[in-house]
Amino acid sequence: DLSKSLNFLARTEIRKSQRVKQLSKGMKTQLHLAIVMGINARMLVLDEPTLGLDIIYRTEFYDQLMNEYFDHQRSILITTHQIEEIEHILTYIMIIDKGKIVINMTIDDIGIHFTQLKTAKESAEQARKLNPVFEKDLLDQAVMIFEDIDVERLKEFGEVSTPHLAELFVAAIKGTHHG
């Protein structure tokens, strides 16, 4: 759909009179994304689509992608290292490390299976006995991620929450880590 591509291009600094070879790397990425917006496919695969763009254009692209492209009849597969930027639009996540799938579940299942605990250093040793899958020190606290644990057991040690995907990504790739 040419109109969607032109609509996206209108929000950039690219002018119709410019030649591609005159464009900066970021502008070339914007041009590619404008072309993507015009594709009418049931499955759209994007590999690091916003690489080289500043945060404003990245945010605008993902907002426009969700508002104008996604209609519940299409699927979008995005590979990215910028998880925190797309976390709010994801329905499913797969984390792959060296060719091996380490997490493969819906976003809703993340909250069911993983719990993050922020605890004072004095309570960390007791919490550690519950076998976190990941741990890091943060100022005067220990931050731990647990898998498939009764949340009530953790509440006595500190603040519990669902980990953000970036934290879960680090936990899945690094595994248990102290320090």
Predicted segments with their positions:
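Generic alpha-helical secondary structure signal
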Residues: 3-7, 59, 108, 122-125, ...
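Short, surface-exposed beta-strand/loop "edge" segments at domain boundaries and coil↔beta transitions
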Residues: 44-49, 123-127, 150-155, 167
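ABC transporter nucleotide-binding domains
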Residues: 1-84, 88-91, 97
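Conserved protein kinase catalytic domain
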Residues: 9, 62, 111, 169-170
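ABC transporter nucleotide-binding domain
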Residues: 62-146
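C-terminal coupling/interaction segments
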Residues: 132-134, 138-179
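Short, well-ordered coil/turn elements that cap or connect secondary structure elements
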Residues: 2, 71, 129, 154-155
